[in-house]
Amino acid sequence: MINIGEVIQWELEQVGIMNLEDLKKTGSARALFMIHNNGGNGCLSMLYALEGAIKEIRWHDLTREEKDKVKNEYEELLKDSAPNM
């Protein structure tokens, strides 16, 4: 997969995402959320790498709008999973 090195591939496999088809079904935001919940280290660069892999482009070629969209999706997942106080 484009943008996906050994470390990210290993992190994906740890959460059951074994190939590009699995990643496309899961989506980049949910995949990073799953990695985060599994104790992995996620960051915006990884999120964009995952989105680029889904679109089969280098993550540097994502538009600002595409980056903002997946970032917002990821932040919503984090917010929804935060304990209510």
Locations of the language-model features?
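C-terminal extensions
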Residues: M1-I2, E6-M85
